[in-house]
Each structure stands twice: as C-alpha cells, then as structure tokens.
Amino acid sequence: MCSSDLRVSFGGRSKEFTDKDRRLSKFLIKHKHFSPFRHQHVMMIIKAPEFVMRQWYKHVVGIETTSDHPTKDHAWNEISGRYVEYSDFYIPENFRAQSSDNKQASEGLVEDQENAEKLWSDAQQKSIESYEKMIEMGMAKEQARSILPLTVYTQVWWTASFQSIMNFIELRDEATAQIEIQEYARVLKKIMLNVFPETTKLWQEVYWDAQEK
C-alpha cells in the first residue's frame, strides 16, 4: 500500500514503505483502524459456480457507505444470461456427507459415491439438455436460463478495497466455510501477497496466523 495512506491525519506523504510505516500499519491493523486500507483497490475477473458467487456477493465489509454513492469503491458486474448462453458447469471431485452436528456443513464422504455421482450427473444433464433445446426452439435466454442448476459457471468483474478482500479471505479461508469457496479464498491470498506483499503479510501476522493457532 502507499505509505501516504497511513498518514493522512498528519498531512504526510511518502513514496517509500519504511520500517516505521510497517510498524504503523501493524498497529492500525491490530487495533482495527481500517479506513487507510480502503484506498487500495484490486480489480479481478472471477470465474466460479453460481452457488459460490451467491456467497461471495454478500461480502460488504470495507465498502464506503458515507457518500451519496454507497458502492463507489466497490464494483460488481456479472455476465448476463439474458445476453449469453451458458455452457460450462462445475463438476465436483467427490460427494460429501452432511455434518452430524452442523446444519450448514459437511464431513467425510457419502458412502455410495457411485450412485451419488449418477443421481447428480443425471439431474445436471437433464437440465442442461432442456436448456439447450429451449434455446434451439427460440425461447428467450432470459427465460430458458431459469432451469439451470447452481453449478453453472458465471464470470464476474470484481473491484474491491484491500480491507474488503482481507475480510473475505479471513472468513472464507476458514474451516467452517464451504470447501469450494475456501479454494477461491486461498487463491486470493496468493494474489494479494503478490500485489500488496508487505501489508498482506502484516495482516496475516495479526489475523490469519492467530486464527490457525
């Protein structure tokens, strides 16, 4: 991040990230003074199944809400099924069993993997074939898409602040999050360590490493 973002209150400006800036950043992160971390933004193109995106777009921490444009530092644009035809679908490697003590979690695998895969594949194939036939007969894409499963891949252009992305990683790269979105959070972490290495490492020291202990 730009060290000047840390010192707005003092009117200071700098182009270098010094040890002093590093200590200040860690102090601000530790004591939850997050506003300086909303000035840095990343724009990403994300391809993910619809059921993952439904969880993703709920993340709003780190978004400016005090202006007349409440999402001015956060943008979300998705490919529309009204204009394009869907043709790519997520296929899981295995089928997990429902957790015995957590209504929203999974644990282990379904014992009959072969039958689970057949049931899943048959249902997917039926909806996809019906969608394609509806398109062929001239039905409007905006209507035909309504029968597609949540495994359909969509693409999103996502612009978010540094804080917003850190919050996403903290909540989704975590044992109780759904496995599929955990995988995206881990990729995001690698991206942020490359784009903002110093500040991301500090965030990791304060929050992620402590979370794993």
PLM features: residue spans?
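Family-specific signature for flavin-dependent thymidylate synthase
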Residues: 1-213
